[in-house]
């Protein structure tokens, strides 16, 4: 007769699994709550204490940490000296271990949980047994996932529990215990060193996608094991097709932009760049400004609104082809209108939680990972230094603050032309700065509000041509970081052409 050790926090399916093992001629060893559940189901169970000849102690902290357990798990069946050692110490072989771990994650996700309460949910014996079984998978079946109960029983019944099958179970164990330990490290390190010597994070697969950035690329979406409430990963999809890889990247960018604004705001994004951002007294007015900012590029865009969507705004959005609309909520009539388009992805996010979205940014490079803080600085007019003879007006200062807020979300080299309520022109991703200036000006010139526009740059001007081009096309005020060895040339050109030039002192590259 073979032996199975069962000790689970999640009792789902454990009775049926145990019955299947008994049918396969296993005797069952178990602990505490698991033993009680199995016995109440009419199964004959051997207690761990009967195997170890040692009682549970320290409020259950020590149950299975004993040579009688781990010797039976780790002994190699192909080594006579291992089997002789077990016989000498009267230790039985254990052929299957089924363990799932203390619910550490669900504990720390509860409001008001203390660190002491969380620490009590750090499993020690469970991972130890799983790792022992997984190390010796050639002889021991390690089972950590209730989804594997039926496959294991089927493999035992048909004698297909071969090395390949066992190796797959062992892999799942080591992935699971590594993720479990990583989550504990994340929890304990939340207020610790921002860049630890060893960086570990764990993610859970949320979605396997039809394809990645392009149709020939495979892709999946993983969510941080410590959920971020204000995130695309935690957004609730109310309607529409499954999100694509590109949808998720664009929606993430749009959410980050929307979090910048306290007043009603609408952000429209295409290919990770804003194509229109509008502010207003209400969400309909903000939509109108975002749409008017670039009524061509918004087609097929991702829209984020930071206020509930009303019927009037929904009716306007319904006239366009849009990929995604995200908002805190939707009025019933507004949702009914938008849901007429079966493929439109309609989603909600908790905007009250956006201050908690302070994750580090990571970028994968060959052989490593770049990690940095988010560019979360909030600039105001008091941060600006006027370096030109002409002083900006109050409305120009407000517009430049808005422009600085937007430009840090645009791919470098980045130029934005704005009023204090609306983007008018966005030049993104050009290899030379004057190229981005030309694109932004060309786009903005057709706007009725261009006469009130200012220009913002994510980095300094390497020469005076950007100032000259903007001024000759009607821009009266420019904000840029400064810091070029040719700053004076730009200042002189601004004075020559009678416009305001402001240095923010802070660069906002985005690659």
UniProtKB/Swiss-Prot annotation:
Transmembrane segments: none annotated. SMART domains: AICARFT_IMPCHas, MGS. GO terms for cellular component: cytosol. It comes from Pediococcus pentosaceus (strain ATCC 25745 / CCUG 21536 / LMG 10740 / 183-1w). The IMP cyclohydrolase activity resides in the N-terminal region. Its EC number is 2.1.2.3, 3.5.4.10. Keywords: Hydrolase, Multifunctional enzyme, Purine biosynthesis, Transferase. It holds the Pfam family AICARFT_IMPCHas. GO terms for molecular function: IMP cyclohydrolase activity; phosphoribosylaminoimidazolecarboxamide formyltransferase activity. It comes from the Bacteria. Belongs to the PurH family. It catalyses: (6R)-10-formyltetrahydrofolate + 5-amino-1-(5-phospho-beta-D-ribosyl)imidazole-4-carboxamide = 5-formamido-1-(5-phospho-D-ribosyl)imidazole-4-carboxamide + (6S)-5,6,7,8-tetrahydrofolate; IMP + H2O = 5-formamido-1-(5-phospho-D-ribosyl)imidazole-4-carboxamide. Residues 1-144 form the MGS-like domain. Pathway: Purine metabolism; IMP biosynthesis via de novo pathway; 5-formamido-1-(5-phospho-D-ribosyl)imidazole-4-carboxamide from 5-amino-1-(5-phospho-D-ribosyl)imidazole-4-carboxamide (10-formyl THF route): step 1/1; Purine metabolism; IMP biosynthesis via de novo pathway; IMP from 5-formamido-1-(5-phospho-D-ribosyl)imidazole-4-carboxamide: step 1/1. This is Bifunctional purine biosynthesis protein PurH. PROSITE patterns: MGS. GO terms for biological process: 'de novo' IMP biosynthetic process.
